[in-house]
């Protein structure tokens, strides 16, 4: 596991908090449903997610106008969500999404905006 910056640590911490609050969703189909029904406020896709997963979710984000970032790893996102690996996360609360997005924008190690 790579050494991560303070901004990404905060992102993972907030993702975990959102999960415990019931405001984070994982799984490609569930994420695409949230995007489709306007429940998503922020999508984070792991940098090491498969090309098919990235394309599928980013296409949905572009079509429905959802905010999407490619940042972090599957392992780190998974640990934040209480799993071993997780390719993508959808934040369904505007407050959590805004806070996480602020930290993603400050992250100097990545955080590609789509």
What do these predicted regions represent?
Residues 1-6, 19:
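Catalytic cores of RNA-modifying enzymes
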Residues 9-45:
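N-terminal first-folded block
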Residues 16, 36, 62, 82, ...:
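Signal for well-folded cores of large energy- and translation-related assemblies
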Residues 22, 41-42, 67-69, 86-89:
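Structural motif
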Residues 29, 48-49, 73-76, 94:
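Short, ordered loop/turn segments at secondary-structure junctions
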Residues 58-86:
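Mid-chain, well-packed structural core segment of small domains
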Residues 78-114:
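C-terminal structural segments of small proteins and small subunits
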């Amino acid at each position: 596991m790579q050494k991560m910056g303070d901004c990404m640590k905060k992102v993972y911490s907030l993702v975990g908090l959102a999960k415990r609050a019931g405001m984070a969703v994982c799984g490609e189909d569930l994420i695409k449903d949230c995007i489709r029904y306007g429940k998503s406020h922020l999508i984070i896709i792991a940098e090491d997610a498969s090309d098919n997963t990235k394309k599928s979710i980013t296409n949905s984000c572009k079509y429905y106008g959802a905010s999407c970032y490619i940042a972090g790893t599957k392992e780190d996102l998974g640990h934040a969500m209480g799993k071993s690996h997780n390719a993508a996360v959808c934040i369904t609360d505007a407050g959590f999404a805004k806070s996480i997005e602020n930290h993603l924008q400050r992250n100097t190690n990545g955080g590609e905006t789509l």
